[in-house]
Amino acid sequence: MPLVVHPCGQQHLPSLRALARDPSLAHEFAQLQTDAGFDDMMADPFLPVDLRWIATRDGEPAGFAFSFLAPTHGGSFAMVRMGVVERHRRRGVGSALLAAADATLTAIRDRDHLQELNLSAWEPNPAAVGFAARHGFRHVRNFWRMERPLGTVGKPQWPAGIVVRTYDGSDRALAGFNDAYNRAFASHYHYVRSSLEDTRVITAQRHFRPDGLALAYREDECVGFCRNARYGDPGEVALIGTVPEARGIGLGRALLRWGVAWLQDDFARPVYLMVDGENESALRLYRSEGFQVALTRLHWSRAIGD
């Protein structure tokens, strides 16, 4: 059967949506199982519309790929998400999609100072492990999905001098959140640099709830934040951080407790978060607040064009 990979335009998004919701891919693409989650991901400020592809076999949609292009220190990195439905696997579809992504990314490597190409998948997935190895990727990181059993949440103990407000949509709140995020995550693995406009896009997405974003201020400066997200039944502590000058005072724990309580009050089932498996301080905090590792996400990397 002829295998064709072509760009995924707006007219192809229904096919991508249907593929992502195939039972063989639903677990890997949980966010895409709801309309709000699908729309938000396709409108992500770091997912260019020209970095999406659809593969067909004999005219039938068989798989897809899309690539996030994330700005970071000194350049950017690409994270390619790929899916091939079960009945079309072991037919070269994944390899063809990766080749299309790599060719497009290689063409813009110098323009965007692209440093690396990444793949990821939930464990266990022996097929993905083998695919990554065959295509020259090396395993570089594990990220963990940690879940917390429903139950009593400790009351946030806000440090002295800290005032917490939910997001009010003002330019001041937007700028404070964006600045605090960049300062909090600048030293993290795969830090994604965010502009004010990037953050504005996030606050306009379907999942965003102003009352689900807490901003912690010391005097007039935003020094911490916790943003929650809902896609269907689960609830995620999607983004939590403190600026370097506000660490070690209990602010992170207080924000985490606020986020968990907000999600439980919103009837989220389960409550979860994602964490870098090598972020020991965050892991200690999350475990001490009742979170346990539920799933492991494998990350692989290679140079663009290899």
Describe every region a protein language model picked out.
Residues F29-F46, A65-H73, H190-G235, I240-G241:
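A conserved beta-strand-loop-helix scaffold within acyl/acetyltransferase catalytic domains
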Residues I54, F68-A70, M79-R91, I240-R247, ...:
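A short, internal acetyl-CoA/4′-phosphopantetheine-binding micro-motif in the GNAT/acyltransferase core
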Residues G63, R141-N142, G224, L295:
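A structural microfeature
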Residues R90-T106, T242, G248-D265, R284-S288:
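Conserved acetyl-CoA-binding loop-helix of GNAT-fold acetyltransferases
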Residues L256, N279-A282, H299-I304:
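Short glycine/proline-centered loop/turn elements that form peptide/ligand docking sites
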